[in-house]
Each structure stands twice: as C-alpha cells, then as structure tokens.
Amino acid sequence: MSTALNSEHETVRPLASFQPSTWGDLFISYSEDSQLKEVYGKEHECLKQQVKTMLLDVTNYRISEKIAFINTLERLGVSHEFENEIEGLLHQMFDAHSKFQDGIQHFDLFTLGIYFRILRQHGYRIYCDVFNKLKDSNNEFKKELKEDAIGLLSLYEATQVRAHAEEILDEALIFTKAQLESIAATSSLSPFVEKQITHALVQALHKGIPRVESRHFISVYEEDPDKNDLLLRFSKIDYNIVQMLHKQELCHISKWWRDSELETKLTYARNRVAECFLWTLCVYHEPKYSPARLLLGKLINIISCTDDTYDAYGTLEEVQIFTDVIQRLDRSSMEQLPDYMKILYKAVLDLFDEVEVQLSNQETNNTYRMAYAKEELKAIAKCYEKEHIWFRKCHVPPFEEYLENAVVSIGNRLAVTFSFLGMDQVAAVEAFEWAKTDPKMVKSCGKVLRLVDDVMSHEEEDVRGHVATGVECYMKEHGVSREEAVVEFYKRVEYAWKDVNEEFITPNHLHIDLLNRVLNLTRIADVVYKFEDGYTHPEKTLKHHIMALFVDPVPI
C-alpha cells in the first residue's frame, strides 16, 4: 500500500456536500411495548378468524361481491394474512372468466375496473377487450360514464396495468384522467370519494409503494359510509403490529450503521438509513420476509455509500484499485486500499459473511446463491468505475452507451438478486439464473429507475461536477433542448412500465412472489423521483412517508 493513497495530499475530489440525515438518532433505540403487543396480538387473532370466515363465505356470492371484498382487503393492507384463500378465489374467477365471459358484460364500471386490475396484479392474463363495451357506435367512451366518479376512478387505476398494443387502455387513461380532474375541480363529492380521486391523480395505486398506499387507504376507508367496522379495526391493528416489527428492524439496521463506522469515516456519503429502509420495505413489507429485509436494508446502505465513493470522493487511482479488489472479494486484498475505503470494503465482506450464515441455516443449504450476488456486485463496481472515468475525462458518451451502463449502475439488478437470497421457499436456482440473464422485466425496471432519476437530478449533478447524466447525453447526441429530452425520457419510462406489466402476466417458471420484487422496485421510482430526487433530498418527498411507516401508529 503506497503512502500516497493513505495520505491527504492535495487531491481534486468531486465533493457533493450532501444534506445530513433528517433523523439523527431517532431510530437507533426502540423499546417495544410488550403489553400493548400482547393485547394487539390477542385481538388480531380473534378478528383474523372472523375476517377469514367472511372471506370464505364470500365464495357463495356473485363475482362482483367477491372481487370487491378482495379489493378492500388488499387496499387495507391485510391480504398478506389470507394469501392462499385469495389466490384460490382469483383462480376460480379466472377459470370461470375463460369459460363464461358473458357474465362480465353485466359488471358496472367500478367492478370491471377492479376485476381487471386485480387479476392482472396477480399475474393473470386477462385481455383488455373486456372494456370494449364502454365504447359507443362512434368508438368513443359512452357519455354516461362521465357521471360515475367512483367507476371512472376504478377504470383509471385499471389503466395503470396496461401493456403494449392496448390502445383502448391508452385512450381510457386520457379519458379518465381528464374526467377525474374536472370532477375534482367542480363537483361536490363525499369525503370518501374526493380523497380517493385527489390522491390517485397524484399517485396511482399500481405505481405506489404498497405499504404507503395501505396506510393512506385506512384513513380513507374510515369515511366510507358502507365500511365494515370489524374489517377497519382489524386493518388498523394489523398495521400497527407489523409496524412494530418494522421499527425493530430499522433500529437493528441503525445500530449496524453506527457500529460499521460508515457514517463517521465516510463523511462525504449520504446518511440515509431510514430512506434506504423505505426502499427495502417497498421491495417486501410482509412479516415473513423480516430476515431478508435486514440483509437487503444493509446492502442498500452499502451500495449508496459505494455510489457516493465513486461519484463524490474517490480519485481515479483509488476507484480503480477498489474496483479491482471488489472483483476478488477476499480479506487479504484489503491492505491495498486507502484507509477510508477499508471501512467500506469491510462492510461489504461482513455483510456477505452474514448472508452466508443465514443461507446455511435455511432448511436446505442455499449458500450457492452467494455466487450470484457477488457477480452482480462485481458488475456494478465496473459500471461505477466506467462512469468515474467518463467524469474525469469530461466524456459525454452516446446515449445508448450511457444507458446500457446506467441501468446496471442504478443497482436494481443487484437488488433483485439480493432480494431473492432470503426467499427460501420460492427462490430456486432457476430464479437466480433468470435474474443473471438480465431479463426484459429487470432491465425495464432499471430503465424506469435510471431515467426518472436522471430527469430529477441532472441539473444538480451538473453543478457539482458529476458524470453526464442521460439527459446531457441525449441532448448532445440529438441536438435537442432539455425540455425535449425530458419529454422523450418520460415516453421511454411509459414504454418500460408497459414492458414490466407485460412480463408480469407472461407465463414463465417463476413464482409470482419473485416477480413482485421486481415490480416493487419499479414502483419505487414513481414515488421517490416523482417531483424531485427524493433520496438525496428526502425532507419534501419521503419524510411524510417515513413518519407514517416508522414513527406514527394508526390511531385506534
């Protein structure tokens, strides 16, 4: 190890001066109220059995009543308690749909919308021709639809799961959005309907973070004049019980962050422990994935620090050595690194050791999975290095060359593979081989994340000195303005979303729980980067969500 790399001699570093954490030590200590947890637990079990009875009873009802009840369970965030029962009902519905499609012609607009959306969100390929009945003889949407606010909202949410070559859904999105905006501005609506419309126009359900959307809907459902009080109370208790677990997990990761010295030794990097855990919670929030969440939460923090090391501190020589060391991933290589990088490299190795222990303790020894995660880490390091070299050389690459690298450096491929590690029962070797091939769904997820990130961050990164974002690359190559480039980016985002939706309903050998991880990663983009770079500047976009998820329980 040369003295030069360990010294603080004059070196030009592209310092970013990121904002400090909003949260301080808020999450580093968590004292669970065991008495309240016990009280909640007893009532939760009692209510769960009653809700399960209601769900089983609904099998004798009409399809419209079945799908409406499932919709309510999912919107309230309690469907994780009844996964098998719900899947059984949906399978029956889809089977009946395939044989007797005439019954759908009698669905009202609200029922048709939730029927289509929910079946697609569970991986069933239901065709968009079910909406043909909404058109008149002039191929326009029937005028009477404009009077049905809750039906229009249901159709609007259904359009969000559209895939390619579904023109009627593209048209329905334009139609419903215009009508809902008009209704919200001019009509006198009940609070129950008004809140749903106002929220949906900002955040579509399909593209939202599931746990965040459930918290919001619980408050909305309280104002439903036809609400089921038992179901409402069950959803509140369930939310608070699961929140206790999430608080405990965030506390664990906060302590790990402190003990790892990443915050104190890598002062140039973003301290975003709570924000990283929000990303983790979007990938999977269900209690059964708690061990997997702890590992993924640590990884996302480490990748954030690694990204900032390449972008906002490391010299060319340092990042080249770090990239080379990452290709080996052995402790003997640590001495080649400058002191500050040793902290980061140690965190990487310690995390992989922790993962290996957890995998070896599963019902079947799944340590083979480690090789896939390591390869993705090596790949992302090479992409970071390439971007650093571009920056040092003031090189603006052709857009497609930039994008090919950037959809890897955004980290979704590594996150997908890592999220599979802790899914003992459903993630067989085929799942890792699938992710390894960079399939269309994963690549499109990366495009959504990268393109919206670039749109929201490119001006700031240009000011502080950073590799050219996709916006600059596209502007230079095509000779267009920033505004024109942004329009093109959002067209590509819409196209990539259709890819994700299409792949989700395309039959393959993967369990739907695995595909949901990719879908959930795509959803992050629509929340974090909707109005600004919410990860770098979380106080406006993410602070409210973090308070709702990790600080404030639902009032009961």
From Swiss-Prot:
GO terms for molecular function: magnesium ion binding; terpene synthase activity. The keyword Lyase applies. One of its GO terms (biological process) is diterpenoid biosynthetic process. Its EC number is 4.2.3.194. Signal peptide: none annotated. Binds 3 Mg(2+) ions per subunit. Pfam families: Terpene_synth, Terpene_synth_C. Its cofactor is Mg(2+). It catalyses: (2E,6E)-farnesyl diphosphate + H2O = (5S,9S,10S)-drim-7-en-11-ol + diphosphate. Mg(2+) 1 binds at residues 307, 311. A motif (DDXXD motif) lies at residues 307-311. Keywords: Lyase, Magnesium, Metal-binding. Catalyzes the conversion of (2E,6E)-farnesyl diphosphate (FPP) into drimenol, a precursor of the sesquiterpenoid polygodial. Polygodial has been shown to be an antifeedant for a number of herbivorous insects. The Asp-Asp-Xaa-Xaa-Asp/Glu (DDXXD/E) motif is important for the catalytic activity, presumably through binding to Mg(2+). PANTHER family: ALPHA-HUMULENE_(-)-(E)-BETA-CARYOPHYLLENE SYNTHASE (PTHR31225:SF93), OS04G0344100 PROTEIN-RELATED (PTHR31225). Belongs to the terpene synthase family. This is (-)-drimenol synthase.
